[in-house]
Amino acid sequence: MKPGGFWPHLALLGVSLPAVLGWMDQGASRSPNMVPGESQAEETRGFEVTRREGLPSPGLSASCGKKLCSHGSRCLLNRTTGQPSCQCLEVCRPRYMPVCGSDGRLYGNHCELRRAACLLGKRIVSVHSKDCFLKGDMCTMAGYARLKNVLLALQSRRQPLPQGTPRQSLASQKRLLVESLFKDLDADGNGHLGSLELAQYVLKEQDMDGSLNRCSPSDLLRFDDYNSDGSLTLGEFYTAFQVIQLSLAPEDKVSVTTVTVGLSTVLTCAIRGDLRPPIIWKRNGLTLSFLGLEDINDFGEDGSLYITKVTTVHMGNYTCHALGHEQLVQTHVLQVNVPPVIRVYPETQAQEPGVAASLRCHAEGIPLPRIIWLKNGMDVSTQMSKQLSLLANGSELHIGSVRYEDTGAYTCIAKNEVGVDEDISSLFIEDSARKTLANILWREEGLSVGNMFYVFAEDGIVVIHPVDCEVQRRLKPTEKIFMSYEEICPRVEGDATQPCQWASAVNVRNRYIYVAQPALNRVLVVDVQAQKVLQSIGVDPLPVKLSYDKSHDQVWVLSWGDMHKSQPSLQVITEASTGQGQHLIRTPFAGVDNFFIPPTNLIINHIRFGFIFNKTDPAVHKVDLETLMALKTISLRHYGCMPQAMAHTHLGGYFFVQCQQDTPTSTGPQLLIDSVTDSVLGPNSDITGTPHVSPDGRFIVSVSNKGPWLHVQEVTVRGEIQTLYDLKINPGISDLAFQHSFTEGSQYNAYATLDKEPDLLFLELSTGKMGRLKNLKEPPRGPAPTWGGPRRVLRDSGLFGQYLLTPAQESLFLVNGRQNALRCEVSGIKGAATVVWVGEV
């Protein structure tokens, strides 16, 4: 570093620099208790000392011999002109003889006082006042902070960033500035700043600020020499200026953590650095620290994220960064493994020799389980033949022609990396002459009440068995309700006919069906076992929507109040599966326009929360299904979204919200809500329409009866939503149903009714392969259903069912999904408003 180049251009700070090595005149060693009159003599001797100290060589003596320099300076030859000139002393010798200056500051010795006077270009003399001695070194923390800001400001003016330098973060710019300042101060380039080097840095008067409070660069050693070795390293210099050096190994940029559902896990942030600021954790861009989540917290001092009980909703991406350093981010991908959960069908069956028999096993888990079959404990894969085969990735065991020796207990075993599950399907082979009681019960009683479609039409309730393709039972409008002896559909005075009006219906554990009769302000309870209407429950006027909360055994009832929907209400029927003795509870929610209760599945068997929508409020309201109390409001106002429908997938915990259309002919956009944080993530890409989620939570199909597009998305094992494809469908979709694939054990297919055409749409979700089933009759005509719902309903037949049912104008059509073909038409049934499938009882 050049003497007289950088340092003389800086200003003197409030307190004196510590005593450092330099030129010292004789007067500097004098006692501060100087008597009056000694100042002039002292100044004369100072000239003489300066002249002698400026004669290091004979050549210089000739040039500076007649050049007199004042205190605090010495004679030097100008390198350009060769002429002698007086320049301020660079440093003073390290001798501590404190002296008060006439400027009110305390100096380490007389040399430093005179050097400061030289640098500042003003007269400063020693005084005998004790004030500055009593004040001592008054560098406060506030002044020290101000000093560091002044040093950085001066450095930025001295060495500005070159033009064209890319704009960087403030933290990065500050780091470069501090590095530059350290390099300039490190005169000997040894990577350590000593007291001598810091003492050379003085500030000019115009750069001084009263708020510095007597602080000097030497105070860097006093405050930030952490190892007390008398020097500052670059690391200590970084710390002094609060420049944090953080690092993240390239291999840690993305960290994948796999944990089994139900366990706890800890995500540790791999960002390292001395004095690292607090770690901030985010999920889907939302900070987790202040949300008060019951199952996630980051209170650990090590900056880790703790998830106390992992479920599939927790899967997805989590990020961590140090506070104020958002440019350095680590991503944690949380994958959740789920042990297999299986169901077999049928649990027991009896067949006669020579007929075909199938045993089916459905398994869900993450990763996808592998299925094997045992017969009486022996692996059947070693017995494969033309008569015995495994279909759909082993999920179906098919016997082409059964024999007596095929009788046995067939065990389905599903395995994946984290667990195993098994169940037994029993097969009995007996001829008709040797029927056992169990055989008779299975064949006759079982088929008489279970595995049926219950159709609610204008002329009553029709029970249809899909295998026989015939009506098993018909409950006419004049049938009596068992407990009240009222008619199912009483005749209105003056009407010649007695049509039934139905709205919504739900299956309650394959025991009862609850169905709404809006015009009669009641809900009927149908006993599946007896195939009779058991009772009626009076509810608020115009009940139009029912939903069964299986987790709490409750049926929720939404009523309009009147045809203008001006007095809507939400009621709950408790203990629904008992069939009688239920209680009707009125909820406290006003202005309800719609509600949503997520369905259960094999993996998620308990639901805690539901959601309600208000007529004029751009928000969804989270409700505790057990206490029936509102918990939280999730505002959609920022997106101008009035919610119309919702769907949910447990994979990643996403809610899909359909917003109302802007115009009668447009389709409503969708928003995504994260169920972990109850926060809106934003639009679901450019997806529009009503969302439908497959039973396993993997596929999301969005359709509309007004728009031409069908969108298919998939949730990956990492909890990420990706769009698979978009299909253009004309006209729009009326209703949609899912059916388990009969060729791929882990896949689902979708069927959809068209709003204005008789065809039935078929879609293989994983591949996008699409087809149409034709030869169906015209769909129901006329205006949209009075009580809401699709114009042309479509109902599947459960997890193992292969049939679907949809109405035409005056008939019903049954479709065999396994063969992807029309099964039959059941004529003479008009105005089918809703359909319920009842599985095995």
Swiss-Prot record:
Residues 173-208, 225-247 form the EF-hand domain. One of its GO terms (biological process) is regulation of collateral sprouting. It is found in: Secreted. SUPFAM superfamilies: 3-carboxy-cis,cis-mucoante lactonizing enzyme, EF-hand, Immunoglobulin, Kazal-type serine protease inhibitors. SMART domains: IG, IGc2, KAZAL. Residues 80-134 form the Kazal-like domain. Disulfide bonds join C86-C118, C92-C111, C100-C132, C269-C320, C361-C412. Pfam families: Ig_3, Kazal_2. Glycans are attached at N317. Keywords: Calcium, Disulfide bond, Glycoprotein, Immunoglobulin domain, Metal-binding, Repeat, Secreted, Signal. Residues 29-54 are annotated as: Disordered. Residues 250-336, 340-425 form the Ig-like domain. Transmembrane segments: none annotated. It comes from the Eukaryota. Residues 42-54 have a biased composition (Basic and acidic residues). Ca(2+) 2 binds at D225, N227, D229, S231, E236. One of its GO terms (cellular component) is secretory granule. One of its GO terms (molecular function) is brain-derived neurotrophic factor binding. Ca(2+) 1 binds at D186, D188, N190, H192, E197. Its main location: secreted. Residues 1-22 form the signal peptide. PANTHER family: FOLLISTATIN-RELATED (PTHR10913), FOLLISTATIN-RELATED PROTEIN 4 (PTHR10913:SF9). This is Follistatin-related protein 4. It comes from Mus musculus.
